[in-house]
Amino acid sequence: MALSLYYDEDDDENENENKDKPNNDFKNQQQINTSKTTNNNNNINNKNNYNNKFNDDDIFNNDKIITKPRVTTTTTTTKNTSTNSNINKTKFNDDDIFDDEDEDSNSNKTTTTTTTTTTTTDTIITNDYRYQKTVPFSSFCDLMNRIINDTKISNKKNYLEKFMNHYKDEPNNFYQLLRLILPQLDKDRNSYGLKEKTLARLYVELLNISPESVDAMRLLNWKKSTNDEIGGDFGTAVYLSLKNRCNNDNGRIKVSMGDINESLDQLSQPLTDKKTKVSILKKVLRSTTAQEQKWFVRIILKEMKNGLSDNITLKFFHPDAIDHFNITSNLRLVCTNLFYMTQSKQKELKDKQKLEEKENLLKQQQQQQNDLDIYKLEIKLFNPIKPMLANRQSIDNLSMILNSAISATQFVVEKKFDGERIQIHKDGEQVKYFSRNSNDSTGIYGSMFTPIVKECVLAERCILDGELIVWDSISQRFEDFGNLKTLALNKDGISGSGDPLGINYGKQLCFIAFDILFVKDQSVMNLPLMQRLMLLKRCVTIKSKQFEISEQTTVNSISQIISLLESAIINREEGLMLKNLHSLYVPAERKDKWVKIKPEYIDGMGNGADDLDLVIIGGYYGSGLNRRGGTISHFMLGVPFIADSTDTDIDDESTFDKNVIFYSFCKVGSGYTDIQLKSLQKDLDPHWNNFSTSKPPSIIQLAEPFKEKPDVWIDPRVYSKVLQIKASQIVVTDKYKCGYTLRFPRVLKIRDDKGWKDCCSHEEIIDLFTNYSTNLNFKRDHEYGDGSGGKNKKLKKSKKTTNQLLADSGLKVLSIFQDTDTSGIIPTQNIFQGIEICVIKGSSGEYTKSKLEIMIVEMGGSKVQYPSRNTNYVISSKEVVKIQNLIQSGFIDIVSFNWIVDCYNEKRLVPLGPKYMIFSTESTKKRFLLDSDQFGDSYINETTEQSLKDSFNQIDKLKLKKQLSINSTTTTTTTSISKYFSNCWWSLFKEFTFYLDLYQVVGEKSTLIENNNLELSNLNIQFYGGKISIEFNNKITHVVLDSLDLSRITFIKNKINSLSLPIQIVTTNWIQLSINNYSIQPILEILD
């Protein structure tokens, strides 16, 4: 037998019977004549042979170069024309393509006509593989090997050109070749549903080898390098595992490119089950060499890794191929249109000019083709158009762009939504959706959203460009991008319980249309944006929060843009889009006609993600054939979290280390040099542990169910490295345990001088996000703690304050974050000495934010841009949106700017009183009551006209705010009770706040779950000192579920994870068991 594979029993029984027969695993398999002859034409007349065959005689032999015009060639090459007459270009000979020494080996093959049809929206050419049947797949593989092994682009293109010059000039032939060279651009075939992990298991099954064997371990752990082999490339792993098991080239039946294409067609059929896929893979495996298998799996994975970009390959095929592909996203159309266009023009040139004049005319023709007007290309429905893209620009460059405007209404600003860029194609009742990469997303969104499209899109035939996002009708806001496909695919997190009120309850898809490309059988891309928007409004009817048109705001100054960006930040929006109303729609173009403005593009704006020290907790093996493939080249970074803060001895270092765990936070793989990476690898290598989902480490906490897991993990308490990270933005996520992550992180420095205790804590990450999301949204429990979180003080604050970062940057920031340069201000008074003040907003008149900060420094005080535990007062002009979250947290006094002005004018520290207060903490209100009544009327000072006015104003305020002194009395009473009766049996739950799972929508009383069994637990909890909360907030310690109905466990877990709160889930049984035993029972014992 030629194979070293393990066959099924049926194969073994028939081995002797079939050993002399050709391998018929491929239908229409070619039969090889192993006898060598010098007369290659003897069998050409065989009636079964296809009369146009690929001829690869000495294709890469520099002494025998065959050159002829191809689709991309517009000049006639005359070099070595003397050899052309001796070579039959229509017959394939695969013996001496890559071996220049062995020139006498040829093979005769018999082929059968094979034609298959691929169903597409617009079928132009059937998959005719007759010519492909004459091209050995080994020739294609040898071509790829030569390209990948040569580092020079010019040599790569030279190999490709030599191969093409031997290739038959027909559009279908070029298409079948290009879809193998560029499988990632082939949209005719559906997804194979085969990735590295699946393929590895299938190969182990096909080879019938032990999963513990060397070859199996190489496949299953293909990313890992060993002492002898470099990992990171699955194709190479397949080759090494099969090279001693598969066919070799001696006397075998060669598989053709047509055979491979047929197998790929079969694998991509949408209803192909696993058994059928295994059968197809087995046929290919038994008929190919290890080298051919390597390239076969790379085609399946759509990762050729040959060093030639998509654009280089397309441009090599034809100068206008890139433009055509951007318009059609269809390789088949590109090959067809450009081939016939070139052939026609070349024929005209032959009739008009002599051979010596042809070269110059063809050069002119090439220039004309390069200047092809893309707007004259035919637009067809259901052929996705590459979307026009937006450029990134700084504030300074935006000024230049706006100054170049020829009219005051030339530019508009739109909101930038955090969704998926989607192109909607509508032809009557048929609607399709395409992603920005031209992938068909109809299967994902069609069933849910097509009825909305039919209702809202009035045009019969059109192409719309826009953003698909998720609207949450309960929270009344747009969701983050990560929730889009979860909603569309109905992954409600209920784990099959059938509960309709999962994490998707109250959510719906919403399409924000911002452009129209095609309407009424005509492209409108050549119209200016202003006209396209007018057409768009005529073609669409608005349906709130389901199908809308992006709102435009005309701008002509930087101040307007900054104001809009401030609002976007406050509203947690992703950013803005600046568009030129005179711009035409150019597919795949990224220029300043459209500009995206995000907070992270404005350096130093204090978005909370500028400069963080994070510890390495995991590693990832790199993939590919580059220098990082097969090594730990990417890292999972984490932050420490104190798992148990109830111990009183916070200075006990061993106890502190014992209680810390590490939450996963982000993944980084850039910013360091190869030398730095090798140094990290050397230092960390002895400490890595393989990560297993069946036995995850307790010290490293990942988001369940392991949405982002490393290949290896490390215990930072034993050894690790701290990396200084720069990122663009901090965002909410469910991929990491922290609940947040960084966008576009990169390493600034490896901090060998720091350990894990010096890096950012989980508490600080929460503060960073709240700073970014609502400017000054701090949560009291995380910033100051509630008296039980003192242990976190052991974590040193290694990160710079936002104020320091802003000062270091020296760049422009938004007004709400602007730090006034007071380096030249010399304090003239000591009124505010030792007092730290944060100014949020000044008046709109004389006393601006900047002037107030200067006054504070002149009076000896210190100013910051964000309040911290050391900040004494926050200053503002009124109850603006930016301080609402601070008011809700209740931990800091917010004072009117008038107090600063009065202190400055009177040159003394004016006592604070109710008239200055925008918000008073409980302690401040108590202090005020010692000197005056609740309306500010002093017990000591004489009443004046002004003080009486102030008292009346305070009465109005108190009527609105209901700030009564009874609250402080109640708090005092509760504290006293806890002090003297804390150990009594009736105080069992005194430290806990419970949320009872009574409502289908959390906190919504109108959605009460009928026939629940939680009423008794409600009474017991309150009787035994516990508190009940009807809101899901950070004060909750436990969520109580009905022991008889645990269907909502997953929903509650998702809710807790989304808020990143340390809340425990218990059942009514746990409540009763704790009461029966007069002590709090272990929770895990009950839930298990």
From Swiss-Prot:
Bias (Acidic residues) ranges: 95-105
Acyltransferase found in the keyword field: no
Domain of life: Eukaryota
BRCT domain ranges (all copies): 827-917, 984-1088
Catalytic reaction equation(s): ATP + (deoxyribonucleotide)n-3'-hydroxyl + 5'-phospho-(deoxyribonucleotide)m = (deoxyribonucleotide)n+m + AMP + diphosphate
Low complexity bias (residue ranges): 25-53, 73-90
Compartments reported by the entry: Nucleus
PROSITE patterns reported in the protein's UniProt record: BRCT, DNA_LIGASE_A3
Function comment: DNA ligase involved in DNA non-homologous end joining (NHEJ); required for double-strand break (DSB) repair.
UniProt family annotation: Belongs to the ATP-dependent DNA ligase family.
Protein name: DNA ligase 4
Gene giving rise to this polypeptide: lig4
